[in-house]
Amino acid sequence: MEMEQKRIPLLQAMGYSDKAIQYILNKTNVGEIPSPTVSAKNQGTCGDIMILYLTIEQNIITEAKYDYIGCAGLQAAASALTEMIKGQTVKNAQKIESSDILSFLGGLPEQKHECALLASTTLKKALETFFSQN
Protein backbone atom coordinates (compact mmCIF):
# COMPACT_ATOMS: atom_id res chain seq x y z
CA MET A 1 0.00 0.00 0.00
CA GLU A 2 2.94 2.31 0.66
CA MET A 3 3.95 2.03 -3.00
CA GLU A 4 0.42 2.95 -4.04
CA GLN A 5 0.54 6.04 -1.81
CA LYS A 6 3.76 7.11 -3.51
CA ARG A 7 1.96 7.08 -6.85
CA ILE A 8 -0.57 9.71 -5.75
CA PRO A 9 1.68 12.79 -6.17
CA LEU A 10 2.88 11.48 -9.53
CA LEU A 11 -0.66 10.95 -10.78
CA GLN A 12 -1.70 14.37 -9.48
CA ALA A 13 1.26 16.00 -11.23
CA MET A 14 0.24 14.31 -14.47
CA GLY A 15 -3.25 15.83 -14.21
CA TYR A 16 -5.38 12.98 -12.88
CA SER A 17 -8.34 14.07 -10.75
CA ASP A 18 -8.66 12.79 -7.18
CA LYS A 19 -11.61 10.64 -8.28
CA ALA A 20 -9.57 9.09 -11.10
CA ILE A 21 -6.71 8.40 -8.70
CA GLN A 22 -9.03 6.60 -6.28
CA TYR A 23 -10.35 4.39 -9.10
CA ILE A 24 -6.78 3.58 -10.11
CA LEU A 25 -5.60 2.78 -6.59
CA ASN A 26 -8.73 0.79 -5.65
CA LYS A 27 -8.84 -1.11 -8.96
CA THR A 28 -12.59 -0.47 -9.02
CA ASN A 29 -14.48 -3.20 -10.92
CA VAL A 30 -11.34 -4.81 -12.34
CA GLY A 31 -12.02 -8.49 -12.94
CA GLU A 32 -14.12 -10.89 -14.91
CA ILE A 33 -17.78 -11.81 -14.55
CA PRO A 34 -17.83 -15.65 -14.80
CA SER A 35 -20.99 -15.90 -16.95
CA PRO A 36 -21.70 -12.45 -18.38
CA THR A 37 -24.74 -11.72 -20.48
CA VAL A 38 -22.39 -10.11 -22.98
CA SER A 39 -18.74 -9.14 -23.28
CA ALA A 40 -16.68 -7.16 -25.75
CA LYS A 41 -12.99 -6.75 -26.43
CA ASN A 42 -11.62 -3.61 -28.03
CA GLN A 43 -8.19 -2.15 -28.75
CA GLY A 44 -7.32 1.53 -28.71
CA THR A 45 -5.08 3.32 -31.18
CA CYS A 46 -2.32 3.31 -28.55
CA GLY A 47 -2.43 -0.48 -28.28
CA ASP A 48 -4.27 -0.68 -24.95
CA ILE A 49 -6.86 -3.46 -24.74
CA MET A 50 -10.10 -3.49 -22.74
CA ILE A 51 -12.52 -6.36 -22.21
CA LEU A 52 -15.90 -5.36 -20.78
CA TYR A 53 -18.21 -7.87 -19.08
CA LEU A 54 -21.87 -7.05 -18.47
CA THR A 55 -24.71 -8.80 -16.69
CA ILE A 56 -28.02 -7.51 -18.04
CA GLU A 57 -31.38 -8.41 -16.52
CA GLN A 58 -34.63 -7.08 -18.01
CA ASN A 59 -32.64 -4.53 -20.05
CA ILE A 60 -30.90 -3.16 -16.94
CA ILE A 61 -27.15 -3.48 -16.43
CA THR A 62 -26.87 -5.12 -13.02
CA GLU A 63 -23.15 -5.84 -13.02
CA ALA A 64 -20.19 -4.45 -14.95
CA LYS A 65 -16.52 -5.41 -14.73
CA TYR A 66 -13.54 -5.15 -17.00
CA ASP A 67 -10.09 -6.47 -17.63
CA TYR A 68 -7.40 -4.53 -19.42
CA ILE A 69 -3.86 -4.33 -20.63
CA GLY A 70 -2.92 -0.70 -20.59
CA CYS A 71 -2.21 2.47 -18.72
CA ALA A 72 -3.60 4.19 -15.65
CA GLY A 73 -5.76 6.37 -17.89
CA LEU A 74 -7.59 3.36 -19.25
CA GLN A 75 -8.00 1.94 -15.76
CA ALA A 76 -9.56 5.19 -14.52
CA ALA A 77 -11.84 5.52 -17.55
CA ALA A 78 -12.97 1.88 -17.49
CA SER A 79 -13.59 1.97 -13.74
CA ALA A 80 -15.62 5.15 -14.14
CA LEU A 81 -17.61 3.66 -17.01
CA THR A 82 -18.51 0.54 -15.04
CA GLU A 83 -19.68 2.67 -12.11
CA MET A 84 -21.70 4.92 -14.42
CA ILE A 85 -23.61 2.11 -16.13
CA LYS A 86 -24.58 -0.07 -13.16
CA GLY A 87 -28.32 0.24 -12.70
CA GLN A 88 -28.79 1.93 -16.07
CA THR A 89 -31.03 0.70 -18.84
CA VAL A 90 -29.18 -0.51 -21.91
CA LYS A 91 -30.75 2.35 -23.91
CA ASN A 92 -29.40 4.97 -21.48
CA ALA A 93 -25.99 3.31 -21.29
CA GLN A 94 -25.79 3.31 -25.08
CA LYS A 95 -25.84 7.12 -25.02
CA ILE A 96 -22.66 7.43 -22.92
CA GLU A 97 -19.84 9.18 -24.75
CA SER A 98 -16.19 9.69 -23.84
CA SER A 99 -16.98 13.26 -22.77
CA ASP A 100 -19.44 11.89 -20.18
CA ILE A 101 -16.70 9.68 -18.73
CA LEU A 102 -14.26 12.60 -18.59
CA SER A 103 -16.88 14.75 -16.82
CA PHE A 104 -17.73 11.96 -14.38
CA LEU A 105 -14.05 11.61 -13.49
CA GLY A 106 -13.43 15.31 -13.18
CA GLY A 107 -10.87 15.04 -15.93
CA LEU A 108 -7.92 13.04 -17.17
CA PRO A 109 -4.65 14.32 -18.62
CA GLU A 110 -5.28 15.48 -22.18
CA GLN A 111 -3.05 12.76 -23.65
CA LYS A 112 -5.27 10.18 -21.89
CA HIS A 113 -8.59 11.33 -23.37
CA GLU A 114 -8.34 8.48 -25.88
CA CYS A 115 -8.69 6.11 -22.90
CA ALA A 116 -12.21 7.44 -22.27
CA LEU A 117 -12.94 6.93 -25.97
CA LEU A 118 -11.74 3.31 -25.76
CA ALA A 119 -14.00 2.71 -22.75
CA SER A 120 -17.09 4.23 -24.42
CA THR A 121 -16.54 2.42 -27.73
CA THR A 122 -16.05 -0.89 -25.91
CA LEU A 123 -19.40 -0.34 -24.18
CA LYS A 124 -21.08 0.42 -27.51
CA LYS A 125 -19.58 -2.74 -29.00
CA ALA A 126 -20.89 -4.85 -26.09
CA LEU A 127 -24.36 -3.32 -26.35
CA GLU A 128 -24.46 -3.83 -30.14
CA THR A 129 -23.81 -7.52 -29.48
CA PHE A 130 -26.54 -7.55 -26.81
CA PHE A 131 -29.08 -5.89 -29.12
CA SER A 132 -28.26 -8.28 -31.96
CA GLN A 133 -28.97 -11.25 -29.65
CA ASN A 134 -32.22 -9.90 -28.20
Question: Where are the model-predicted features located?
Answer:
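Domain-level signature for proteins that mediate thiol-based redox and metal-cofactor handling
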Residues: 1-134
